[in-house]
Amino acid sequence: MQWAVGRRWAWAALLLAVAAVLTQVVWLWLGTQSFVFQREEIAQLARQYAGLDHELAFSRLIVELRRLHPGHVLPDEELQWVFVNAGGWMGAMCLLHASLSEYVLLFGTALGSRGHSGRYWAEISDTIISGTFHQWREGTTKSEVFYPGETVVHGPGEATAVEWGPNTWMVEYGRGVIPSTLAFALADTVFSTQDFLTLFYTLRSYARGLRLELTTYLFGQDP
């Protein structure tokens, strides 16, 4: 019995050590990356259009991002609004840019929703275009509410409760180990809604983003 208990503790210690080493490797890898976008850049651009009709704001934002970062934003024919079910909430996203270490997307809900934010190996920031964003941080007893023009930052490893009012739309930027966020983003789709067409759309959007980045890296930007 004591031998079995000791063996379990040894395995637990080994797993913790592996996790610690893996975490260090991940952060060292991120430290070597050159990023296309900056969090404040995305937030500042989004703030320019806060309060406008969200569709008008999004169209103007896309034009500006393409001007500033040619070869890094998906073309119109590959932009698609896709449902997202995760953490008990439901929204929709339109992916503009994706790589292994960062992404830019449009996100929101026409009806309102609430649930768990998830924990990520990534920093995620949302700048609100319209509506309201309520956030209840882990370890606190009060929630905060954010309005158009404000930016909500979700740090790596953090967890919060989130709630969006009806017709809340925002611009989201993520930086970190982006493939690790897909497990949370797709879990409800796989194990709850079983909407495998949405699963396909989500993975296809991410694959298109990766393909665009690879093409730009290999062949340069379009003139």
UniProtKB/Swiss-Prot annotation:
Presence of keyword Transport: yes
UniProt cross-references to InterPro entries, sorted A to Z: ERG2_sigma1_rcpt-like
Q: Where is this region: Targeting to endoplasmic reticulum-associated lipid droplets?
A: 2-8
Please give a single GO biological process term from the UniProt record: regulation of postsynapse assembly
Region described as Important for ligand-binding: spans on this chain:
99-106
Question: Key word Transport present in the record?
Answer: yes
Subunit structure, per the record? Homotrimer. Forms a ternary complex with ANK2 and ITPR3. The complex is disrupted by agonists. Interacts with KCNA4. Interacts with KCNA2; cocaine consumption leads to increased interaction. Interacts with RNF112 in an oxidative stress-regulated manner.
Free-text comment about domains: The C-terminal helices form a flat, hydrophobic surface that is probably tightly associated with the cytosolic surface of the endoplasmic reticulum membrane.
Q: What is this protein called?
A: Sigma non-opioid intracellular receptor 1
Organism in which the protein naturally occurs: Homo sapiens
